[in-house]
C-alpha cells in the first residue's frame, strides 16, 4: 500500500475516532468519552481486518463458487487479469435492486459483489462494464478506505441513535444543564452530516477515476454508460429499503434514493456527468455512442 493511501487511511480513522469520542462525551461526559474511545480503538482494529466481512454480512451477500456462477466468475477473472490484479472473490447479494460494490483491504483479499437484480437487468457487455468499474476500485486501492469509512460511519450512526434516545428519555438535572442538551442536539444533527462529508471526500473523484479505468480495462465505455443509465432508472423507482446508508459511497450508484438532499452532498457524481465523461473517453478510444 502506497504512502499516500496510508496517510489518507490514517487521517480518515483519526477523524472518525475523534467524532466518535466527541459524541461519547456529549452522551456520558468523561466516562462516555472513555467508553467511546475504547469502542473506537476496537472498531478501528476490527474494521481494518474484518470490514469486508462486516459489509458483506450487512447485505447477506454470499460468496459463490465457479460452479454456482460460471459466467460471472469468467468475467471477473478475465477483467482482473486485464487489470493485472489477483482474481477477487465473487459474491451475490439477494436483492432485486440492481447494484454492485467491491470491498476488501487490497487486491490480495478483495471481493466483488453484485446483486441478483443487476444480473437480471444488464446484458453481458453492460455487466462487464460494471465489474470492470469495481475491479478498478480494487486496482486503485480504493476499497480499503471505502470499507473503513462505511464501518466507522455506521458506528457513528449507532452512537447518534443512542444520543437521540438519551435526549428523549434521559434525566437531566442542574449539573447537566441545557448546555448538555444543546450538545446532544448538535451531535444528532451534525454527526451524520460529517459522516456524509467524509464519504463525499473519498467517493466522488474516485468514482470518476474508476469509471475511466474500468472503461479502459473492459474497452467498453459505452456499455458502462448504458449500465449506469439502467441502474439509475431502476433505483429511481425501486430504491434499496434495507441496508446501511453509511455504505452508500461503496456502490456504483447510490442505492438509497432520498438519503441525499442535494447534489452538493451526494456521495456520487451525477450520473449524467459520469456518462458525459464516458462519451469523451469513448471518442478517445475511437468509439461513438
Swiss-Prot record:
Keyword set, alphabetical order: Cell membrane, Hydrolase, Membrane, Metal-binding, Metalloprotease, Protease, Transmembrane, Transmembrane helix, Zinc
Cofactor needs: Zn(2+)
EC number(s) on file: 3.4.24.-
Gene Ontology annotations for the cellular component aspect, listed alphabetically: plasma membrane
GO term, biological process aspect, one: proteolysis
Active site: 134
Domain of life: Archaea
Cofactor note as given: Binds 1 zinc ion per subunit.
Signal sequence bounds: none
Top-rank EC class of the record's enzyme: hydrolase
Membrane topology field: Multi-pass membrane protein
Entry's transmembrane regions: 9-29, 31-51, 143-163, 182-202
Molecular function GO labels: metalloendopeptidase activity; zinc ion binding
Location in or out of the cell: Cell membrane
Pfam families per the UniProt record, alphabetical: Peptidase_M48
Binding site residues for Zn(2+): 133, 137, 207
Alphabetized InterPro entries for the sequence: HtpX_protease, Pept_M48_protease_HtpX, Peptidase_M48
Similarity remark: Belongs to the peptidase M48B family.
Protein name according to UniProt: Protease HtpX homolog
Amino acid at each position: 500500500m502506497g504512502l499516500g493511501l496510508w496517510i489518507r487511511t490514517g487521517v480518515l480513522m483519526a477523524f472518525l475516532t475523534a467524532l466518535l469520542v466527541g459524541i461519547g462525551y456529549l452522551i456520558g461526559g468523561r466516562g462516555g468519552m472513555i467508553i467511546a474511545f475504547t469502542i473506537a480503538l476496537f472498531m478501528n482494529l476490527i474494521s481494518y481486518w474484518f470490514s469486508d466481512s462486516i459489509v458483506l454480512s450487512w447485505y447477506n451477500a454470499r460468496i459463490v463458487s465457479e460452479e454456482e456462477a460460471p459466467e460471472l466468475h469468467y468475467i471477473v477473472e478475465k477483467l482482473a487479469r486485464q487489470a493485472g490484479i489477483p482474481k477477487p472473490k465473487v459474491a451475490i447479494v439477494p436483492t432485486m435492486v440492481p447494484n454492485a460494490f467491491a470491498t476488501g483491504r487490497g487486491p490480495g483479499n478483495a471481493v466483488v459483489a453484485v446483486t441478483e437484480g443487476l444480473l437480471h437487468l444488464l446484458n453481458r457487455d453492460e455487466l462487464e462494464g460494471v465489474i470492470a468499474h469495481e475491479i478498478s476500485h480494487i486496482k486503485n486501492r480504493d476499497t480499503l478506505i471505502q470499507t473503513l469509512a462505511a464501518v466507522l460511519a455506521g458506528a457513528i450512526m449507532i452512537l447518534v441513535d443512542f444520543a437521540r434516545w438519551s435526549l428523549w428519555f434521559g434525566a437531566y438535572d442542574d449539573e447537566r444543564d441545557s448546555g448538555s442538551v444543546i450538545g446532544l442536539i448538535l451531535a444528532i444533527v451534525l454527526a451524520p452530516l460529517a459522516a456524509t462529508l467524509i464519504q463525499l471526500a473519498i467517493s466522488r473523484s474516485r468514482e470518476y477515476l474508476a469509471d475511466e479505468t474500468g472503461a479502459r480495462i473492459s474497452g467498453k465505455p459505452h456499455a458502462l454508460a448504458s449500465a449506469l443509465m439502467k441502474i439509475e432508472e431502476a433505483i429511481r423507482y425501486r430504491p434499496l429499503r434495507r441496508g446501511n446508508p453509511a455504505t452508500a459511497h461503496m456502490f456504483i450508484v447510490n442505492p438509497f434514493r432520498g438519503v441525499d438532499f442535494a447534489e452538493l452532498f451526494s456521495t456520487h457524481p451525477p450520473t449524467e456527468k459520469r456518462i458525459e465523461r464516458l462519451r469523451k473517453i469513448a471518442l478517445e478510444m475511437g468509439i461513438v455512442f
